[in-house]
């Protein structure tokens, strides 16, 4: 053909040309989808079909999306696209997480609020209005971002956790749990955010970045023992029990000290005469303080100390009932500290349990903001961390401080504000997870985890140790805890509500807003109070926002008030995906609530991917600039390139991924460019449209069709088990075979417009773009529509196995041919023998070499040799070497492993016909050794991958071979000259060559080769007219169109 205008393609033109940049093409596709409403059509096309239920975890919309959202979003698009093409209906409702601390923190920033008291002064209505306006601040940016990544979601039918219907379903869930006896109010020590003035759940302290390195003071403090005269250890009277703590601020609240009953303790006299009591194992740790002349006076078990009294370091709570005694506690260790533990039950869970068991009620000298109250006058108003240095100073002044040091340790922080937490006893509402924990473990066995090890590992272990879940937050913006209690303890009553109808029944009004303060205004007289004076008032707490996101499967459809039949038949969901940290977050809360409410898993399959890291291997940071800007990548390389980079990576198998610009660009070369090049090649040479055909008898056509059939099966199998990276590898391997083998080796057939070749490539591209559609949705759309003229590849069906002829034997053999050629070409490169220089011979030595006989001509042409010699006698050209893996073999063979190693080094080993290896009379297992095929002449020989055989290259260059190589080099230069003159690849030309005397005979000998390759109708040797191209070696060429 003369030019692109004669081409049969594209049938649908995006107006960008074959040389367009991928980002430009992508934008045109996105515009076409929007105009055509293609996404909606993909749903409607499957009306009445079996449904694939996908849960889209709701992000917070008051922050901008990042790489983590991008990665997860691509997975959330690949699987639904694939399932849609497989004939399923896949609704994809987008959701928004609207409640909780993220919204409140954003509102506080906007309003200039730095303290909770300012919210009370402002009024809850105004503050929550600000929260509501902030939560959907970035929905427009999210929509643009999601659209640009070519992710199809339903924004118009989205769900929001602040919607009345959603909140009513959450209320129903709470009431259902309460009715099952799985909700209770308790007073427990919990992770507490003094900054946000609310407790957190234990799983929230296990989220990524919850623990950070922090420096804190550590003090060793004296507590003087008081021992009655009749006690067996009366000599301890006046001795100092030593405690060690990293929270000096808890010392004013000390109510007990604890020892381990079975640990050995000592009474010693320091060099200065002061007497101390501590664990024997910890004495050496304080040798500097005790002095060289310290003397152990007595040694005894901790049990002997139990019951003794002592004087606390501060006297704020002297006389507290049953306090200031030595208690026994099995959790006391001697790994650090002194082996004597200071106990402030308001600030330690284990402290609280032990003190409670010994009838010691806690004292709470902190306000909700973590500041000391008037119960400890010297420190009143000080925040706990600010109080540390003041307390330490007072201890030192009182002579009670033995040691003061600074330690750096991993410490929990609020996952939202980033402020360090404290542990504090607070009243909270709990889901009694421990009552059904074993059932959660059982139901987890029904879930398919990707990667599989998370099921019994990270998630399974977490379930086994699951604790009751604190679901209440002392905050403002969230779903209310639907509990009303009497305001007079003389007439106690508790009412729990599970629907708007129930609220309307008791309060006479149907709420239109369940948020505070509107819901708090619902009050009524206490029916159990005959005086009529007490009122039923709602408890002030709101629900943990994780309770809401864990409720999304049913709350998004307003279950059980609507869509009950639909939900019952579509639960559990088929698939969810998030990063693996959600084993402590969304995955966990979904599983807890589904188990408790429905005795079922919430999902059948879950993919838990790794973390995206910056190009330095560290967490992505704007300030460090250690990652490429997403929008810049979209503009430079395109969304498909980014999608390929992320989807083909180990991150989808649980590993982490370092994002680099180079890695993203490799996605272009690995997948996009090969498919695009094959498509532009077809456009260039097909003057008539190709047809769907799979009956060509040409070996290359048969091979590529069979290779495609194999790829179809491999990709189908991979995507069915959510192995997206595996599907990418299948497609990458095929794209390489298509462009670097089939198209390149078929060029001459296309030049003559061989219909078998055109039809085969048309068919291959039509199927390949359907296979690539979920992984490369934008470029696949351009190619498929240009090829077929159809509406969208995403409305097409996934290729069926019966569509393509399978021939695994041909694929295997041809792939071996390709491997042989690649090995020979690598050998040529190592010896600096350019491919255009013909060589005499290559020998292929392999046990199955004869199967390559029908393809010897292909090998010869590909590697440019005159002859291909096939032999099964590998031993002539090389030998196998064995290496023993001592680490693997040692546990089984014991001392014999050295005897085996010695025998192998001496060459005393054998391999039977069925592949069993023995050495020194001992059979080795496959994992206990490695074999390597070693060439007898390494300079001219290379081993095939997998020790499959050897290739031996005759590298002797005769003058005849050199002459032909020179001619082929000349052809390449003349082709470049044609190109520089703007000639079409099919244009015929007249050429005059001016060749130096030394090379004239070579030119004459290879006249036909030169003329044929450059499409010269006439080729003359003489003086080249002007203008003439200056070529290598003094050759000049005059070229004009025939």
UniProtKB/Swiss-Prot annotation:
Binding annotation for ATP: 622
Motif ('KMSKS' region): 619-623
A GO CC term attached to the entry: cytoplasm
Signal peptide (UniProt feature, chain positions): none
Key words, A-Z: Aminoacyl-tRNA synthetase, ATP-binding, Cytoplasm, Ligase, Metal-binding, Nucleotide-binding, Protein biosynthesis, Zinc
Description of its domains: IleRS has two distinct active sites: one for aminoacylation and one for editing. The misactivated valine is translocated from the active site to the editing site, which sterically excludes the correctly activated isoleucine. The single editing site contains two valyl binding pockets, one specific for each substrate (Val-AMP or Val-tRNA(Ile)).
Protein name (database record): Isoleucine--tRNA ligase
Organism: Nocardia farcinica (strain IFM 10152)
Gene name of the encoded protein: ileS
């Amino acid at each position: 053909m003369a030019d692109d205008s004669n081409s049969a393609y594209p049938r649908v033109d995006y107006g960008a040309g074959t040389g367009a940049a991928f980002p430009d093409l992508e934008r045109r596709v996105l515009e076409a989808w929007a105009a055509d409403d293609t996404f909606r059509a993909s749903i409607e096309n499957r009306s009445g079909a079996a449904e694939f239920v996908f849960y889209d975890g709701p992000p917070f919309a008051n922050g901008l999306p990042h790489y983590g959202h991008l990665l997860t979003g691509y997975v959330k698009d690949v699987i639904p696209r694939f399932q849609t093409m497989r004939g399923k209906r896949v609704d994809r409702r987008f959701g928004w997480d609207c409640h909780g601390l993220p919204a409140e923190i954003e509102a506080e920033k906007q309003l200039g609020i730095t303290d909770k008291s300012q919210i009370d002064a402002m009024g809850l209505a105004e503050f929550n209005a600000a929260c509501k306006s902030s939560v959907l601040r970035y929905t427009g940016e999210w929509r643009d971002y999601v659209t640009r990544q070519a992710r199809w979601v339903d924004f118009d039918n989205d769900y929001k956790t602040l919607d009345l219907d959603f909140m009513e379903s959450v209320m129903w869930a709470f009431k259902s749990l309460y009715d099952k006896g799985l909700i209770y109010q308790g007073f427990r020590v919990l992770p507490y955010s003094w900054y946000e003035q609310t407790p957190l759940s234990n799983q929230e302290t296990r989220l990524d970045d919850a623990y950070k390195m922090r420096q804190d003071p550590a003090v060793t403090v004296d507590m003087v023992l008081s021992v009655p005269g009749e006690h067996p250890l009366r000599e301890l009277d006046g001795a100092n029990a030593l405690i060690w703590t990293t929270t000096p601020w808890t010392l004013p609240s000390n109510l007990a000290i604890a020892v381990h009953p079975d640990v050995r303790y000592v009474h010693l006299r320091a060099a200065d005469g002061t007497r101390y009591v501590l664990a024997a194992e910890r004495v050496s740790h304080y040798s500097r303080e005790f002095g060289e002349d310290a003397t152990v006076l007595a040694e005894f078990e901790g049990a002997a100390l139990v019951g003794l009294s002592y004087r606390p370091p501060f006297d704020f709570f002297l006389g507290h009932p049953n306090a200031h005694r030595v208690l026994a506690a099995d959790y006391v260790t001697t790994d650090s500290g002194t082996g004597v533990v200071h106990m402030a039950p308001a600030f330690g869970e284990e402290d609280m349990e032990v003190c409670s068991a010994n009838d010691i009620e806690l004292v709470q000298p902190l306000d909700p903001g973590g500041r000391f109250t008037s119960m400890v006058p010297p420190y009143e108003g000080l925040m706990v961390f600010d109080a540390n240095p003041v307390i330490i100073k007072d201890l030192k002044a009182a002579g009670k401080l033995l040691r003061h040091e600074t330690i750096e340790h991993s410490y929990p922080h609020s996952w939202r504000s980033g402020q360090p937490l404290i542990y504090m006893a607070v009243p909270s509402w709990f889901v009694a997870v421990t009552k059904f924990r074993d059932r959660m473990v059982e139901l987890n066995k029904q879930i398919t985890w990707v990667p599989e090890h998370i099921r019994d590992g990270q998630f399974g272990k977490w379930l086994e140790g699951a604790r009751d879940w604190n679901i209440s937050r002392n905050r403002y913006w969230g779903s209310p805890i639907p509990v009303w209690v009497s305001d007079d303890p003389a007439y106690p009553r508790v009412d729990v509500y599970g629907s708007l109808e129930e609220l309307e029944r008791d309060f006479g009004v149907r709420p239109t807003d369940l948020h505070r303060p509107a819901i708090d205004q619902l009050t009524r007289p206490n029916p159990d109070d005959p005086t009529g004076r007490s009122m039923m008032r709602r408890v002030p707490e709101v629900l943990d926002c994780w309770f809401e996101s864990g409720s999304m499967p049913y709350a998004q459809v307003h279950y059980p008030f609507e869509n009950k039949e639909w939900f019952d038949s579509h639960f559990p969901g088929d698939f969810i995906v998030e990063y693996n940290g959600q084993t402590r977050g969304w995955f966990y809360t979904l599983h807890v609530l589904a188990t408790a409410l429905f005795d079922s898993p919430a999902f059948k399959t879950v993919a838990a991917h790794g973390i995206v890291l910056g190009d330095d291997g560290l967490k992505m940071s704007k300030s460090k600039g250690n990652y490429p800007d997403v929008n810049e990548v979209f503009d430079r390389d395109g969304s498909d390139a980014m999608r390929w980079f992320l989807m083909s990576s180990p991150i989808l198998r649980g590993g982490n991924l370092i994002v680099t610009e180079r890695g993203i660009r490799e996605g272009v070369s690995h997948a996009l460019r090969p498919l695009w090049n094959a498509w532009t090649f077809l456009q260039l040479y097909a003057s008539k449209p190709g047809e769907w055909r799979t009956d060509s008898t040409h070996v290359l056509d048969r091979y590529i069709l069979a290779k495609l059939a194999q790829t179809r099966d491999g990709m189908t199998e991979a995507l069915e088990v959510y192995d997206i990276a595996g599907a990418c590898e299948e497609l990458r391997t095929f794209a390489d075979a298509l462009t670097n083998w089939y198209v390149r080796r078929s060029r001459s057939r296309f030049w003559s417009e061989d219909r078998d070749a055109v039809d085969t490539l048309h068919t291959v591209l039509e199927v390949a773009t359907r296979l690539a559609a979920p992984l490369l949705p934008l470029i696949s759309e351009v190619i498929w529509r240009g090829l077929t003229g159809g509406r969208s590849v995403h409305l097409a069906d996934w290729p069926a196995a019966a569509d393509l002829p399978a021939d695994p034997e041909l694929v295997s053999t041809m792939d071996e041919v390709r491997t042989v050629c690649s090995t020979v070409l690598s050998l040529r490169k190592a010896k600096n023998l350019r491919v255009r220089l013909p060589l005499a011979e290559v020998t292929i030595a392999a046990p199955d070499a004869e199967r390559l006989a029908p393809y010897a001509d292909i090998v010869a042409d590909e590697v440019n040799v005159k002859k291909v010699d096939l032999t099964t006698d590998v031993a002539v050209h090389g030998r196998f070497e064995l290496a023993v893996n001592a680490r693997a073999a040692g546990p089984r063979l014991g001392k014999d492993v050295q005897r085996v190693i010695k025998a192998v080094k001496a060459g005393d080993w054998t391999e039977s016909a069925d592949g069993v290896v023995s050495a020194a009379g001992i059979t080795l297992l496959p994992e206990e050794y490695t074999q390597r095929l070693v060439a007898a002449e390494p300079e001219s020989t290379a081993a095939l991958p997998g020790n499959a055989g050897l290739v031996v290259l005759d590298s002797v260059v005769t003058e005849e071979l050199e002459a032909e190589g020179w001619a082929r080099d000349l052809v390449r230069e003349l082709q470049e000259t044609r190109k520089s003159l703007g000639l079409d690849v099919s244009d015929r030309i007249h050429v005059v060559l001016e060749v130096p005397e030394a090379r004239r005979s070579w030119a004459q000998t290879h006249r036909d080769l030169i003329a044929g390759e450059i499409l010269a109708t006439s080729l003359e040797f003489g003086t080249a007219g002007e203008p003439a191209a200056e070529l290598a070696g003094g050759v000049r060429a005059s070229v004009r169109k025939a």
